[in-house]
A protein has these predicted regions:
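Short, structured secondary-structure boundary patches
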Residues: 7, 54, 64-66, 80-84
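Alpha-helical residues within the helix-turn-helix
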Residues: 35, 52-53
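N-terminal helix-turn-helix DNA-binding core of bacterial DNA-binding proteins
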Residues: 2-43, 62-74
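Amphipathic alpha-helical dimerization/coiled-coil segments
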Residues: 2-3, 24, 74-97
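Short, hydrophobic-biased segments on the C-terminal half of alpha helices
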Residues: 48-49
Length: 97
């Protein structure tokens, strides 16, 4: 069973959030992601592994291609909600100043 801390730790990096957002649009090969993200290939692989280990993305083989897909679409709702909360907090902080 995945615990909530593992999931939130996986979401604690902007690159992993961007990966999830990209993969929520369509299934992608890891080689395609290398062209989309301006980070080192080994760093990208590490981020993918963290998301796979957290159960947030799935890897499937299609011939020689390793395809990645968001395993739970509701995680995108969690990301959107966290973004809304962040904006709310910023507004409240600005109002107090």
């Amino acid at each position: 069973m995945r615990d909530i801390i593992t999931i939130f730790k996986a979401l604690s990096c902007k690159w992993r959030i961007k990966l999830l957002e990209e993969l929520s649009k369509e299934v992608r090969c890891s080689c395609e992601l290398e062209n989309l993200f301006p980070i080192d290939k080994s760093t990208l692989s590490r981020h993918i592994k963290i998301l796979v280990d957290a159960g947030l993305i799935e890897e499937t083989r299609n011939g020689t291609r390793k395809e990645l897909n968001v395993s739970h679409k509701k995680i995108i709702d969690v990301i959107k909600l966290a973004s809304e909360i962040t904006k709310d907090i910023e507004r409240k902080t600005l109002t107090k100043s």
